[in-house]
Amino acid sequence: MISYTYITALSILVLNVLNVACTSVDDWPNLSPQIEIALRSQRDIGKYISIDQVTGMGVSLNTLVFDKDGYTLDALNDVSTLLDVGVQTLMINLYWNEFTQKWQLCPAPFPANISSDITTSKELYWDGRTYKCEASLTVDSLVRTINTYLAETNTNIKVNMVHLLFHLKSIRIDPPSGNVSSSEIKDYISTFQPTDSHFVALNNATLNDTVSSFGTSLFTPSDLSSYRKSNYRKGDKVGFYNETRKSFPNLNTFLLLDYKRVMTTVIANDLVKSQYTYNVTSSDKKSVFLEGSGVDTTVASLSDPDAVSQCNELIHYNQDNIEVFDNISLKEHFRIVVDDNGTSFTNVTFSDFVRCGFSPILNASYYNVYNDEEGVSEIDGSLSDIVDNFIPLSFWSWAENQLIEPNRGLNISDSTDTDNDEERDDNDNDDPLVRRDMDYKSSHTAFKCVVLDENGWKVSDCYSRQPIACQKSGSPNDWHIDVKTKREYFTAYKDDSCPDDYNFGIPSSSIEMLALMSYIERENISYPVWIDMNDITVPDCFVTGGPYATCPYQMTVTRLKLAGLIAPSFIVAVVILALILCEKIFRTNPIQSNRKRHWKKAINKYVEKYDYEGVPS
């Protein structure tokens, strides 16, 4: 018989297995921070948009990090923080050191007499400026920092694309002017060629080597060429973005099917031509997107009046011609705009370029940011203050300060149909105080659906009656809204809500959003308007597909997962049962053995005493 102790142990084991299974269903990550929810929802809505149309805020590491903190390993902590808070584009100056014939991050060459302690920062004077540089800060160390971030976010919930923009520059050999001999030039060059073995082992001699540590997560020109030649792109969901030969994989293919995370692009090449300059190798062309490698990056400058005026014209475009938006979506790729100390972004210009489909790159040392405590705007050079100011403005989708509890968007329903019968009748209460109380009571459960207003997406009461944004199939920049048809969100997805060939839709990119807002302005339609998005099933998990769409991140236990959960515990249980069985078979109990010998002896004595032969008479 199995002892009570063993039964108890097995019971606890079974309960633990069941507890693990149940916990896996309910324990999905708590993604309550506003920015994280906005980042994930915008990414999910745009996952079938080609990667060249994905936009996001960027930062110049040289201007805002290294020039202020020094070119040291400690500065990489800021890089990690930038990635963590949602900055997905990093602009970096790569310097070709003509003295050492290697790429480095420090803008100045290290002297030949540098100490063997490569982790000590040095004050280096070069080209009229003094830099604080640490030899151990290499491109490899930067890549390792980014790889750490990639590993930490390698889940379906957090995965995203990181774009590195390289500006190539030269640390040129410029010997003293005048009549100098070749030996004097050689001596001059040697003064900036450290011979210490620790230093010589640092940095890389080719662009390919600088990015090779990304491994298979790097999306390369070779990958793009293979994608365009294969039939793979035919399987991408949004055919509109695959109409040209210069098509790119969509974000879903990039991240979740091909498992790519990083793309490196040279956006400017200021290498000085000389006998010591860098020559691009065939390996470079296969790993880094250079000019002519199939990516025509659009780089605009904020100081360029034409770029500003073109963006303003696009925002206020009121002509019935969707080709303007289609041409941008199909013919312009990776659109970025960079500012400088002469013309830095304001909140308005930053937001405008985001709306125009650009990725704004912060490249100025100081910005006019809003101080919440003082309630005023002030010039600030703090990286954290600058990023905190611009991150909420970096979404082409969500309006600023959305997703903040408890209000969750519009405070008062725009509907006057208070009895929710989809008709305006005598049963509806026009008293604003009564309506306010009714809206307040339902706000905690009904504010789960998304509308579009003049500032972007906002969470609203699902029972409010609004016009419906209808998007044409196969033509995502073509919209239709019938102002006479106002419905609750729960009925907006029905077939009769939109004309033939149109469906209840949502903008999946900044240009689609701009096309919709242009249509609304042109048709003089009042905001807000329903778009197909809600978090009804799981809080903070915004999905498209109507009110019954399920959250893709809600944990479920399939048979395979359940088998995986139970298998380890089942093996342990089998081992325990085997041990119990072995104990029953092979273990000898002294008390039980003595008892058997006693009775056997007594029986033998009885038999000897009363032993009979034959049948007693």
From Swiss-Prot:
It is found in: Membrane. Residues 1-22 form the signal peptide. Residues 409-435 are annotated as: Disordered. Belongs to the MTC6 family. Residues 416-431 have a biased composition (Acidic residues). Coiled coil: none annotated. PANTHER family: MAINTENANCE OF TELOMERE CAPPING PROTEIN 6 (PTHR35518:SF2), MAINTENANCE OF TELOMOERE CAPPING (PTHR35518). Glycans are attached at residues 113, 179, 204, 208, 242, 279, 327, 341, 347, 363, 411, 524. Its main location: membrane. Residues 583-617 are cytoplasmic. It is a single-pass type I membrane protein. One of its GO terms (cellular component) is membrane. This is Maintenance of telomere capping protein 6. The keyword Zinc does not apply. May be involved in telomere capping. The chain crosses the membrane at residues 562-582.
